């Protein structure tokens, strides 16, 4: 069964909402049915960026396990690891570092954000 452009747009919007809300199980089902793991919204935010920024470690782990690009920056050149660091999601930062996230990518980079906010990296 194929989706109309309108239906696909709604599924993609729901996918971003699930990443933002930490709906890991539901998002995983969407991925199982063909939603791209590196899907981005109109602002360039990937599913991983939204999950990381909103401190949803379980969702971040699932997306990493499914091959999400840990360095995919949004339209403002922000990386998922810098977003997680900004929000104080230390567990997510460690997870992204463990997955090989580039700490010097983006503006500001995770290193720059850590220095600005006095957080260890």
Give the location of each predicted region.
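TPR-adjacent "capping" and linker segments in tetratricopeptide-repeat scaffold/adaptor proteins
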Residues: 1-9
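Alpha-helical segment of the N-proximal tetratricopeptide repeat
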Residues: 10-29
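Ankyrin repeat domain, specifically the short helix-to-loop turn at the C-terminus of the second helix
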Residues: 28-36, 61-69, 94-102
């Amino acid at each position: 069964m194929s989706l109309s452009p309108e239906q696909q747009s709604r599924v993609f919007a729901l996918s971003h909402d699930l990443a933002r809300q930490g709906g890991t199980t539901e998002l995983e089902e969407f991925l199982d049915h063909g939603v791209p793991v590196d899907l981005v919204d109109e602002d360039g935010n990937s599913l991983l960026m939204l999950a990381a920024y909103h401190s949803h470690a379980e969702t971040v782990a699932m997306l990493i396990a499914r091959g999400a690009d840990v360095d995919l920056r949004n339209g403002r050149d922000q990386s998922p690891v810098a977003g997680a660091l900004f929000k104080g999601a230390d567990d997510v930062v460690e997870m992204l570092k463990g997955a090989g996230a580039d700490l010097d990518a983006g503006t500001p980079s995770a290193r720059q954000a850590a220095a600005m906010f006095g957080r260890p990296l």
